[in-house]
């Protein structure tokens, strides 16, 4: 379907842009302003990469409980907004209402799937889909979340990563950008002696 979209985009007057957000940037957002602001910035970048056309209708899937606030935050960061006779609207579940937003969701999913394949190839083993329910992804954590650190291509702030660390590694869960604490447990609760 992705190929179909791009084959018909020009003649139909459709535009699309994807923005790749690295695990590091997601972790930094979680430590800082939060995911809502990261998503606002990503939409600003994607919209900024679109051709500036007259009478454009831009619809986003609201990533904020307040859809109007999400729209305003995006618009505020666009240096050349508003475009002539154009609208920018955010709605919850827009991918269920507007086919164009559903297509954008498919394009993003295809991009994510390619990134997971590239990660598997660069590591030399299958890391799965990257979703917490995927047994292959869970199994890959044994090779990606090591005692001496977490792989750079993994979201360190991901609840699945943190849970895996707490169940399988010692000490505090590492925080990206900070050196590991020198204070690590010297022994496990089930050991009566210091090792």
Language-model-detected regions and their locations in the chain:
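RNase H-like, Mg2+-dependent phosphodiesterase core
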Residues: 1-195
